[in-house]
Amino acid sequence: MANSYLVRTPGSAGNTKKFTISAWVKRSLLGSTYSTIFSSWSADSIAGHFALRFDGSDRLDLSTWSVNVLTTNRLFRDTSAWYHIVCAVDTDESTADNRVRFYVNGVEETSFSTRNNPSSGQTFSVNNTNSQTVGLNNYSSTAGSMDGYMSHVAMVDGQQLAPTVFGQTDSTSGIWKFKSPSGLSWGTNGFHLKFENSANLGLDSSGQTNN
């Protein structure tokens, strides 16, 4: 799956300051330069490039063109495990540390090797009228492919959400598991990719027809 990715260019802009990305991922190649979950690109700038990925040291990382926004201390090296990754963004938040939040398997990440909070009101290329890509760092057709498996990739345009919208703890096993999001306002460019249709892997199940 190293070279598989999906790309969409929205016809109209949504909220470039507030959004939530959720994805279930299972890694297969460790120590890759980058292993990208979601990216968007319009220009070589902070506002123009956004990449949610695992870095070459297997840390979860959010980077813009020239700034690493968040990089975890935690390493993600279990190739047998599914990780539920949530990146929740709201740059209008008055508390700087709440402008970008990472959650893994329902628990917020709080230990970071790098933290550069976005400025208040910072815009990103996410939800803008430029390429939005799942599984590749889309400033290049060969950069930072996911090298793993992905399931239930979702993006909610206009809301900074908790992981409990997309997952829940199993009452018997105590394991964090998928929960179908319901009652959501997905926003202009929101989508939910289940990857259930092999003939149309980019089929949007959110009801927004953002295929």
Where are these regions (language model features)?
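Beta-strand-rich interaction surfaces with strong enrichment in secreted/lumenal proteins
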Residues: 9-11, 71-77, 121-123
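Extended recognition patches within non-cytosolic domains
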Residues: 2-3, 94-96, 101, 110-115, ...
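Extracellular glycan-interaction patches encoded by glycine-rich segments
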Residues: 124-150
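Extracellular beta-rich ligand/substrate-recognition surface
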Residues: 1-5, 45, 62-69, 113-115
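Extracellular glycan-recognition modules
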Residues: 3-61, 93-96, 159-164
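Short tryptophan-centered beta-strand motifs in secreted/extracellular beta-sheet-rich domains
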Residues: 23, 80-91, 102
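Beta-strand-rich, repetitive solenoid scaffolds
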Residues: 9, 39-41, 50-55, 61-65, ...
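Short, aromatic/His-centered strand-loop micro-motif at the edge of beta-sheets
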Residues: 62-84
